[in-house]
Each structure stands twice: as C-alpha cells, then as structure tokens.
C-alpha cells in the first residue's frame, strides 16, 4: 500500500484521490476549507465540485497539510495554476518541518501568468531537491466528471525518473483507469497547456453555429501549430501524438465538460469574456495560456495563426466572425505549412 497526499479538493484532485483510495491506497486529500473536509469525511460527497458523486469510504480529507503529507510516499498537487506557488511554498515548509522527502507529482494544466513558467518549473523553484526525490506530471484526456463515474479513461505520467512514474502508474491504474508512462515532462506539460487554447476556439465555433467539419479543421490545423512550437521549445514530437498531446486535445476540444470549451461556447453565443468568467465561477486556464503562447510564438519565431486569432479575440476584442474570416482568407498553402 502506497501513502499519497493529494493537495487540492477540486473536481480533478478529488477524482484522482478517489481513484487511488478505491485502489486500496492510503490517501489523504488536503483542502483549504475545513467544512469541505468535514463533508468529504462524514458524507462521502464533494457537492461543490462533483455533485453527483459518492466517494470512497477509504478517502480521508483534512485541512491540515502536515496531516496530509506526513509519511507520504507521493504528494500530488492538483490546484489551479494561480495557486501553485502559494501551495508549493506551504508544502516546502511542511516537508522541512517533517524532514521528509517525497515523489512530487502534479496534475495541473497551465502556465504561470506573467512568467509563463510550466508547473514543474514553479514547483522546482519553491521546493528544494532535499524534499523531492523526483518530479512527474499526470496529463492526458481525463475529465473528472467521467473518471468519478468510472468511465474508461487513459492518462499519461511523464517524468525522467522511471521508478517514480511507474509507482504512480501502479497507484492510479485499475480496470477503468489506465495510466501509461513517458519520459517527456516538458512536452507533457506544454501540450497540456496548449490544448486549452484550442478548446476555447472549438467552443466558440459551436457557439456560432458551426458544425463538426469546422471543429475537425480547427483541431487538426492546431496540431501543426502545437508541433512547431513544441519542437522549438524542446518537447519530443512523439508526445504530441500520444495521450498528453492529441488525446487531451480531442477530449478538451470536443467536450462540454471542458471549462475552456464552455468559455469559448459562451463567447460564440455573444457573451463577453467577463460574463463568461462570472457565469462559470471557475478558472479558465486557456485565457492566460493564450497570451503566454502568443508571446512564445514571437519569441521562438513560430507562425501560429490560430493562436494569434484567438489571442486577438480575447485581448484585442476582435469580433469572432472577423477572426474566422481572416483565417479562412489566408493565402492557400500546402497542408504541411502553417
């Protein structure tokens, strides 16, 4: 039995913690909110984030990070990008007080606002190597709402430490949740962030009344942009065509369960970005990621017309119809060109 602390009791953190608990592991789910911990422990529910789910009897929640982390083999951080540094600082202090080293994992898909750093870079800066034996990422096509219902799901666990990725693989895998491993931490994180941009565009197309043809064209042409930027930044090309890349792109770009897709849907229906954000009441990671990747495209001299169009809609108030018209009116090219 492996001891695992999951930091963050949102929908995805709860779903991953519940999966590991159902697999027979000692799982402690940390939350900022004491009332949420009480609900999870007493009612075996998390109604704010997974209203229809009944959680494992083996899942224990706490608002005390030291209780969650003590003697753990793995700490899995599953908080929004904007909260990663704050939680990482608290985790570093907790590990120092406990004088304890763990395998550090995360399942957050995004880039830091302002610095555009990947999650692993943020965690590495805040948590000394003394307290982390390895750093890995969980990515791939996985909506929490489906995982908690035991829908068939496959994810990828990326990192250079094979012992660490294989341990987390064993902790999470069962008959309905299958984890694979890869060695490309950078690519796994980068592609997980990039697909959020595409999901906004895909949702916007549906909101405007376009059909599957338009969505398929968007997703396929976006793959070309993702490939070019990924290679420029040091990702492995094969990762793009695996679960962390195209797998995540498909599920996020086609499913109403995706908050980025829903954000795009609202924009396509004529709502402002502020209205969409207020209506959802949740973090839309793709909005910040769009600005980051637009800046990356200029820094690495990669032409990314779809990303540029979505950036102009989000940040320059360019009408969606005009952005689409500009994309469709570009000079005709070979399919392998941007």
From Swiss-Prot:
Q: Where in the cell is it found?
A: Cytoplasm
Coiled coil region boundaries: none
List, alphabetically, the InterPro entries matched.
6-PGluconate_DH-like_C_sf, 6PGD_dom2, G3P_DH_NAD-dep, G3P_DH_NAD-dep_C, G3P_DH_NAD-dep_N, NAD(P)-bd_dom_sf
Its pathway? Membrane lipid metabolism; glycerophospholipid metabolism
GO molecular function annotation:
glycerol-3-phosphate dehydrogenase [NAD(P)+] activity; NAD binding
Which residues catalyse the reaction? Answer: 195 (proton acceptor)
The record's section on HAMAP family has: NAD_Glyc3P_dehydrog
- What name does UniProt use for this protein? Glycerol-3-phosphate dehydrogenase [NAD(P)+]
The coding gene here is: gpsA
